[in-house]
């Protein structure tokens, strides 16, 4: 089969935003205007096409990013051929940042939605940081311009101030709040209005209202200046007073957007059907095709040092990244992949280069929100779901077995909160194990383990809402009823002092004995190193080199169990520099035990200390309740970092230990008669005060 859409006409984009900026409504409109769904879904009715889990429809928030394929030829059919959009809708709730992170990893561009009233909110900053991390070119869409207090230029100023990026508006708003009528298109210098009769499908262009002409001229020259900075040639032309053509301006803005130098801004109201077609036009005009961005990097599975790359081209060897695993009630496991190079047909064999395992592709489907269309092949630039993968986890690479590559992996955050779960009945016991296994395969920020002492099953995740929803899914999708314990904080441990410790394990008990002996220098790890930094300085073969990996393993295993109160030890540098061995009695096991024994002594010799997770908390509250909210945060050992006034009320920023924040949602509501809202995300680990250490150590007993 030949390619139906040239790769230059592909746009792989994500719609990302803060919880209530109107992201899902915007995605719904995208589907409507691109002709994929004939009835508009409203989030308020719980009928949105992309929100397909029951929990999402009930809570009105998006939890799993659905990938949808749609086509667009321009709001006024200005393009000769259709462009193919692969759109990913992502959640904005902080407990699901992992979903946003993994979608951004496979996108080529993003539309970042802001609310015209509340502007830059805490989660917007998180999403923006993630987009920076993956270098994703983006367009800003200021939505909800029909809401009370909406102000396009104020949001633009906020983005500049709080996100450190200067947006370049290519539109201005005509009116605002109840009087929001449309946009000024700064490229064509026309006013654009929308008709209710066709649900805002086709723009109506008219001259700019006289009272807005001066403002439009000012912002047009701002846009032209941004374009002129794309090259010396354009800059000279601009400085000499020559007019730049709209084609030159467009090409220059596109070049600078893709390079990440500028962010273009548009506005509208998705709910009132005013402006989404122009957002789609901007995606075509300014966001990159897979061929416009650098080739994806990877490494040779046999030698990590050897770097490789794959270009977005059908003729290159096949490579794809699995960015999401979902369980579907009808077909079982769906593995969502982004194809970076080559072609894959159903029935083909591929290799999972991370695990070195062969997989055969059964069927392939392209998703339209919750409906699916079977396809026979996927090509470079495509996003599709594969059925029949046996052992693939999020972030792994599928590729041609003869030309293997491991694409750059994703980093997943460590969970900060844990709860014990118990099945309500004996029958649920086995079902619960299967259900938790499937959920953990889908979501890498969710972990399951068994407490060796109590035999309880412990689940860990990114926040209370995250775990609530997973337990809820267990009940609905797998029919498992479970009781949940009280949330527990995931503490960490670290050492504060440098020390040298001897680990010696000798056992003689008739026949063959055990002998392992090593000297290890321990120190806090270098800045930015979370795990174990292991160094081998053994010279002269006093410890044979085949036993060195066993020493590393012994240290790692003890780190998992901690040295102070049984919590994982982080940021440790261990240098093995001396030791001895026995010709007959030495083996890997003996050296592993010796290293583990040395590590255990760190509590005393290394100044071991307990760390607690600190959360960045933002509370938005009416001024009347500000005193109560701040007093309460102080009582929770919070540190107030600052305050600012916004349209939605006072915003209080603080850092608070997670252990003090359980049940905060209920407390802050009752304190403010339901009018305050808050968001929090993990910030860092800090030394825990002595009373916490005492309590935790006692509990661990």
From Swiss-Prot:
The keyword Protein biosynthesis applies. It is found in: Cytoplasm. CDD domains: EF-G, EFG_III, EFG_mtEFG1_IV, EFG_mtEFG_C, EFG_mtEFG_II. GO terms for molecular function: GTP binding; GTPase activity; guanosine tetraphosphate binding; translation elongation factor activity. Residues 8-291 form the tr-type G domain. GO terms for biological process: ribosome disassembly. InterPro entries: EFG_II, EFG_III, EFG_III/V, EFG_IV, EFG_V, EFG_V-like, EFTu-like_2, G_TR_CS. Transmembrane segments: none annotated. GO terms for cellular component: cytoplasm. It holds the Pfam family EFG_IV. SUPFAM superfamilies: EF-G C-terminal domain-like, P-loop containing nucleoside triphosphate hydrolases, Ribosomal protein S5 domain 2-like, Translation proteins. It comes from the Bacteria. Gene3D superfamilies: 3.30.230.10, 3.30.70.240, Elongation Factor G (Translational Gtpase), domain 3 (3.30.70.870), P-loop containing nucleotide triphosphate hydrolases (3.40.50.300), Translation factors (2.40.30.10). Keywords: Cytoplasm, Elongation factor, GTP-binding, Nucleotide-binding, Protein biosynthesis. GTP binds at residues 17-24, 89-93, 143-146. NCBIfam families: EF-G, PRK12740.1-5, small_GTP. HAMAP family: EF_G_EF_2_B. Belongs to the TRAFAC class translation factor GTPase superfamily. Classic translation factor GTPase family. EF-G/EF-2 subfamily. Catalyzes the GTP-dependent ribosomal translocation step during translation elongation. During this step, the ribosome changes from the pre-translocational (PRE) to the post-translocational (POST) state as the newly formed A-site-bound peptidyl-tRNA and P-site-bound deacylated tRNA move to the P and E sites, respectively. Catalyzes the coordinated movement of the two tRNA molecules, the mRNA and conformational changes in the ribosome. This is Elongation factor G. It comes from Pseudomonas savastanoi pv. phaseolicola (strain 1448A / Race 6) (Pseudomonas syringae pv. phaseolicola (strain 1448A / Race 6)). The lineage of its organism: Bacteria, Pseudomonadati, Pseudomonadota, Gammaproteobacteria, Pseudomonadales.
């Amino acid at each position: 089969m030949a390619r139906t859409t040239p790769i230059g006409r592909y746009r792989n984009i994500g719609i990302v935003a803060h919880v209530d900026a109107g992201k899902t409504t915007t995605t719904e409109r995208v589907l409507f205007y691109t002709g994929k769904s004939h009835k508009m879904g409203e989030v308020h009715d719980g009928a949105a096409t992309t929100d397909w889990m029951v929990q999402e429809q009930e809570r009105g928030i998006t939890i799993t990013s659905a990938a949808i394929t749609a086509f667009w030829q321009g709001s006024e059919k200005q393009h000769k051929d259709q462009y193919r959009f692969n759109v990913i809708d992502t959640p904005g709730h902080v407990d699901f940042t992992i979903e946003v992170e993994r979608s951004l990893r496979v996108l080529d561009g993003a539309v970042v939605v802001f609310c015209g009233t509340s502007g830059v909110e805490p989660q917007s900053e998180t999403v923006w940081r993630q987009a920076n991390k993956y270098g994703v070119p983006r367009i800003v869409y200021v939505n909800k311009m029909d809401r009370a207090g909406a102000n396009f230029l104020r949001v633009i100023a906020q983005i500049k101030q709080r996100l450190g990026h200067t947006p370049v508006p290519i539109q201005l708003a005509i009116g605002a709040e109840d009087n929001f009528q449309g946009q000024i298109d700064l490229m064509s210098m026309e006013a654009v209005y929308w008709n209710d009769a066709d649900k805002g499908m086709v723009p109506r262009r008219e001259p700019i209202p006289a009272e807005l002409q001066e403002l439009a001229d000012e912002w047009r020259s701002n846009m032209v200046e941004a374009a002129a900075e794309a090259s010396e040639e354009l800059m000279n032309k601009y400085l000499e007073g020559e007019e730049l053509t709209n084609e030159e301006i467009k090409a220059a803005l596109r070049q600078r957007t893709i390079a990440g130098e500028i962010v273009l801004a548009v506005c509208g109201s998705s709910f009132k059907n005013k402006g989404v077609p122009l957002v789609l036009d901007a995606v075509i005009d300014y966001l990159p095709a897979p061929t416009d961005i650098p080739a994806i990097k990877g490494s040779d599975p046999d030698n990590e040092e050897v770097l490789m790359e794959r270009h977005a081209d059908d003729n290159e060897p096949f490579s794809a990244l699995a960015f999401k695993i979902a369980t579907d009630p009808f077909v079982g496991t769906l593995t969502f992949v982004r194809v970076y190079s080559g072609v894959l047909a159903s029935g083909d064999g591929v290799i999972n280069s991370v695990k070195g395992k062969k997989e055969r592709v059964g069927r392939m489907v392209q998703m339209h929100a919750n409906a699916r269309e079977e396809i026979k092949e996927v090509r470079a630039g495509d996003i599709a779901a594969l059925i029949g993968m046996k052992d693939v986890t999020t972030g792994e690479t599928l590729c041609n077995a003869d030309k293997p590559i491991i694409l750059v992996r994703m980093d997943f955050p460590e969970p900060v909160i844990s709860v014990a779960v118990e099945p309500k009945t004996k029958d649920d016991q086995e079902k619960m194990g299967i259900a938790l296994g499937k959920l953990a395969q889908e979501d890498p920020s969710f972990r399951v383990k068994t407490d060796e002492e109590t035999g309880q099953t412990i689940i860990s995740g990114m926040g209370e809402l995250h775990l609530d929803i997973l337990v809820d899914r267990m009940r609905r999708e797998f029919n498992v009823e479970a009781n949940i314990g009280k949330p527990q904080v995931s503490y960490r441990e670290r050492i504060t002092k440098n020390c040298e410790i001897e680990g010696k394990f000798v056992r003689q008990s008739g026949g063959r004995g055990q002998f392992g002996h090593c000297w290890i220098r321990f120190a806090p790890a270098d800045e930015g190193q979370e795990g174990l930094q292991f160094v081998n300085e053994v010279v002269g073969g006093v410890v044979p080199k085949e036993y060195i990996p066993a020493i590393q393993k012994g240290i790692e295993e003890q780190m998992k169990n901690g040295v102070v109160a049984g919590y994982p030890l982080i940021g440790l540098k261990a240098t093995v520099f001396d030791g001895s061995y026995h010709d007959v009695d030495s083996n890997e096991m003996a050296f592993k035990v010796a290293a583990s024994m040395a590590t255990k002594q760190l509590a005393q010799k290394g100044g071991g200390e307990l760390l607690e997770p600190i959360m960045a908390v933002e509370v938005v509250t009416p001024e009347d309740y500000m005193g109560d909210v701040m007093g309460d945060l102080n009582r929770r050992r919070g540190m107030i970092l600052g305050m600012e006034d916004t349209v939605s009320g006072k915003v209080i920023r603080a850092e608070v230990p997670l252990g003090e924040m359980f049940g905060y949602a209920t407390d802050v509501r009752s304190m403010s008669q339901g009018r305050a809202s808050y968001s929090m995300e993990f910030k860092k680990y800090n030394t825990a005060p002595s009373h916490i250490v005492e309590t935790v150590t006692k509990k661990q007993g």
